[in-house]
Amino acid sequence: MARIHLIIILLVISSTSSSSSSLREQEEDMIKALPGQPQVGFSQFSGYVTVNESHGRSLFYWLTESPSSSHTKPLLLWLNGGPGCSSIGYGASEEIGPFRINKTGSNLYLNKFTWNTEANILFLESPAGVGFSYTNTSSDLKDSGDERTAQENLIFLIKWMSRFPQYQYRDFYIVGESYAGHYVPQLAKKIHLYNKAFNNTPIINLKGFMVGNGDMDKHYDRLGAAMYAWSHAMISDKTYKSILKHCSFTADKTSDKCNWALYFAYREFGKVNGYSIYSPSCVHQTNQTKFLHGRLLVEEYEYDPCTESYAEIYYNRPDVQRAMHANLTSIPYKWTLCNMVVNNNWKDSEFSMLPIYKELTAAGLRIWVFSGDTDAVVPVTGTRLALSKLNLPVKTPWYPWYSEKQVGGWTEVYEGLTFATIRGAGHEVPVLQPERALTLLRSFLAGKELPRSY
């Protein structure tokens, strides 16, 4: 397996661009201006990188450089989860990107808490079939999984850094949320093995990664979701006891008795936004989808004011696609936030990320895990249960951290890993608590503990 991995990497390296062609490719990918965009002082690039020639799989990226010292600031790759959901629709447009989309999808306005003040941000739509990323082999949409996604994300990075050689050897970090709790550590492991295979200074200079409200271990994620729903008075004592009695948190398929327990839990939830239980739901959405999501039956509501629909209007505009060098064939299809064909046909999903965490903490990478504390879908309870099984020695005991003269959350520092909660944030931490999320990022990039006082 390792030999096959090395052969693939060598083939990728042999196909990388020369310096003259990389400059030309950068010029072709440069975004002059997005429709409705305010004036900005930073450069943007977007386009495609082919990751599988035979199947015609190409991944779409959007790079937003920092407005100051972009030539020295680190590169940060942002990944959203799903699996099958767009990092451009969520991460770039709702969370950490420089722009927000207005309600009519006609204009953009600035996000004053954008993360590109601290790093050059690279958004990647992965795997093929998500967002603008595509495959010429339709069966690929029903054959995606963890392993292929991690491998092709690595191939993307190697080829992308050939196109943008100024980012080779630059400090590099990976950050993601939700099912990117798989993508991020799996890609970090691929990069770590890739760097070990070449005994020289790595062009992908991975320094660390950070995962927010991420899938970590199916057993503890599921158990934690039940505990969270009960402890936050969302389900009854009777239903909670029934879930604990009839649901196996290690099985992929649920029993009939477990399904009944989950059915009653769903009824007791009501129409609550499971991703942010104290936030209003988007009352204008008519196509809300119900997901079991491997934990509890919850209804997928996104944070008001219905930013999902704004993104779908904007990124389906032909002039936006032309400006972003997306959908170059102009084949009519609808850009969506999540590809449910990919989601519903996911082939391989590792049961636990804990073995990878053990391996990469030992490798000396900077690893942070954070949780918005109002998320009932991938809640803080499950994450804490999973982290406790790593049995890492405590360096700095639990304490409150501060942001803008308020408690931003709580944190504990272990040997090789930092855990932090973000008070008042949901599944998408930067949506509800953008300033606290930015404080978190600054501390992470600086390699410093979160502020103890204001």
From Swiss-Prot:
Keywords, sorted A to Z: Carboxypeptidase, Disulfide bond, Glycoprotein, Hydrolase, Protease, Secreted, Signal
Record localization: Secreted
Active site: 178, 375, 427
Expression sites by tissue: Expression not detected.
Signal peptide range: 1-22
InterPro entries reported in the protein's UniProt record: AB_hydrolase_fold (IPR029058), Peptidase_S10 (IPR001563), Ser_caboxypep_his_AS (IPR033124), Ser_caboxypep_ser_AS (IPR018202)
SUPFAM superfamilies (alphabetical): alpha/beta-Hydrolases
Glycosylation sites recorded in the entry for this protein: 52, 102, 136, 287, 327
Any GO CC annotation of this UniProt entry: extracellular region
Gene Ontology molecular functions: serine-type carboxypeptidase activity
Top-level division of the source organism's lineage: Eukaryota
Presence of the UniProt keyword Electron transport in the record: no
Biological processes, Gene Ontology terms: proteolysis
Keyword Transmembrane helix included in the entry's annotation: no
Cystine connections: 85-338, 247-258, 282-306
Job of this protein: Probable carboxypeptidase.
Protein name: Putative serine carboxypeptidase-like 23
Biological source species: Arabidopsis thaliana (Mouse-ear cress)
